[in-house]
Amino acid sequence: MTVNRLADYLEHMRQAASDACGFVEGLSKAEFLADKRTQQAVVMSLIIIGEASTKIMDHYPTFIEKHANVPWRNMRGMRNRIAHGYFEINFEVVWETVYSALPELLQQLSIVFSDVDQEPY
């Protein structure tokens, strides 16, 4: 019997996105770019988001199709770029992701969460 972990993966994504936004709260871009500890915390959050996205893509293709507006592949791609090209991380892109993409992702996740129990995935 396979356990449905979809809600768990989505919650990991929500928590990591919320954490990343919290880590940079009150920081300017210059402060973020000079703060290695915050950079590392945000990067780890992005890896968690990408890993959960990958799990959802691999195990719940119907859910992915139904929620095609969520940037599942982009999240996986960012995770792969960070994990496999660690010495080449562009922290300006990371900053833009946290300030632009993650608030939007949090809104999208609140919508897709309501669909988790609607159908068996």
Question: What is each PLM-predicted segment?
Answer:
Residues 1-121:
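Solvent-exposed interaction patches of small proteins and small membrane subunits
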